[in-house]
Amino acid sequence: MAGMVIAIGGAGVAQQRGEWPGITGGYTGTRYSTLDQINASNFNNLKVAWEWRGEKDAGIPLGGEVNARSLPIYVDGMLITTAGPRRTVVSLDPATGKTLWTFQEPVTPRQEYSMRANHGKGVAFARVNGRGVVFISTPAFFLHALDAKTGRPLENWGGAVPVLGFPKTGSVDLLKDLIADWEPWTSLKQQYDPNAGIPLKIGYITSSSPPLIVNDVVIVGNSAEQGYNQTRIENVPGDILAYDARTGKHLWKFHVIPRPGEFGHETWENDAWKWTGDVSSWAPLSADPERGLVYIPTNGATMDYYGGFRPGDNLFSSSVIALDVKTGKRVWHYQLVKHDIWNYDTPTPPVLMDVTVNGRRIPGLFQVTKQAYVYSFNRQTGEPIWPMEMRPAPQSKVPGEKLPATQPHPTRPAPFDLQGRTEDHLIDYTPEIKKLALAEAQRRGLLAPLFAPPTHRGNAEGAGPANICPGGGGGANITGPPAADPTSGVLFITSTSGCSLTMLAPAKERDNPRMTGSTISPWARGGGGGDAADAGAGRGRGAVGRGGAAASTGGNPLAGIPGIFKGPVGRIVAIDMNTGEHLWMIPHGETAQETQDAFRNNPLLKGVKVDTNWGRSGHAAMMATPTLLFATGMTADNRPNLFGIDKKTGTRVGAVQTPSLGGYGLMTYLHNNKQYVVIPVPGGYTAMALP
């Protein structure tokens, strides 16, 4: 077998053919294509080439949540993706969007329970013995290998799964391999049921991102239920699994929660390593085939906002881990957040590209984060490209919680969005406005540092919910992964300036017995707050959104101003990773016109020049080509658009209206000498091309 041929430092052979062989464009997470048929001179001529909707065009039930998370791959003239809560694999005609074939895993209780069923982000591709093969990991946590041309399960691959309706070959039960040496399962001494999986009282595992095939090895990540909903402390660890791409044979497993004798075991006190879990890799993986390394971004441990039952730094949660592809051995790691209680999962695949720093060529790895930092490493050694500082961290007053004394902070590049909320972040168009904004921030308890810990109900200080900024939605997040130009070393990041007002309450008050685990935590999120605007209202018609808005009720002198903290509320930032310098920053899309008008007409701003475009809350879907950054966004008249942006200046050079607003990235391919741009939209895709 020869896997995808992608040059780490450049666009690679596959992309030179106009292919998009992985959901991020290849192994590197750059979302970069060498295609330039669409450029600044003709961008505004783009038209809808075809549209595909899973329910209408393939009979795929969409379920309660409409999927807009998956991106197709394009290789060997085939366009292949996933759709729907059963993660149906679909092959589409690249020129028309017509459905060519589908593959759907039989229904199981494991699939029906999955909280990530509609979170599928796509498929993986490799050549096995000269044949194109598609790999898919499913909500029920099975792995399937399919013939890319027909969608049929691969012969003599994997084994027979003893569940009604499953193919006789071409499948692997990932759960069985995951729990084979896990004590909470083995101590139950009960027969394994591949249909039902494991009892919820010990945990549940699923998947959202596709596997990655590197040097004949299929590497599989996973995900758990959303940690912000958890109330119980038991769960299964999200260990990384690997299989032979040619046979389906299980090769190795990496323990994300170290066991006795393994590196990092001492970071789990209270014997929490025995029974708690998560630390999954729900974001897509990246890899360097030439170096034989795969890079794993992980999330936090069980329960996003309380970790008193798991004292210690909790390796390898909220980290980037480099593993040897052949052996699964750890080569290096860096923990971005110690003892994560902020929902600061590592949310996007690491971006791999070579850069020149102070005259020295470095194989770089760049990890964007919810906390609005870019962490920069030598991807071979794990050495930070610029110094990291361990700075004192705020401490928790929640009973039972013990936080690390310090947290790591990159010294370069500067944060790409607001961190915490300080007086320097307040709007200051005039001294009077600054004074009013400060009073509002103090009244609502909104001033807080980065890594402000959650408060708890009934605290002695009478404090309200902690203002965690950025919140669990970022900063950066998977809803808008970064893009990069590996030829110049420039990284493009989309971020949002939202915060999360977070207070804990006794977990027994909001316990849900359908969730995993059996022991109720002392505390869980739910004492008040939630995703919040920076300064109150503003969620109504024309509102900017989670970035914050001043209350619009009568008598408020700040009425109409979108927020008491500086905008934009959503942004796109370009950073030269050769120097760590910010090149430009623009708002993500355009604030609704009625909001801009109310902003401009505030009496306190009479005679003051103000930029009323604070963009839109949320993230853009992006990709890069030799001349352009493509990004989705809304215009002031509330119409979804695809924008063409000059990569050097951030200037918009084109805009075309699209049927729906996209998310989770873009992709492009060349088919029959025509370049297409595919936008994931609710329930399917819209493809744009020149007439």
Enumerate the language-model features and the residues they cover.
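Bacterial N-terminal signal peptides
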Residues: 1-9
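Mature N-terminal segment immediately following signal peptide/propeptide cleavage
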Residues: 12-57, 72-74, 382, 573
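N-terminal pre-domain segments of enzymes
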Residues: 12-38, 405-439, 525-549
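Short, solvent-exposed loop/turn elements at domain surfaces
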Residues: 27-34, 56-62, 81-82, 89-90, ...
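Extracytoplasmic/lumenal domain signature
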Residues: 44-57, 89-113, 143-201, 233, ...
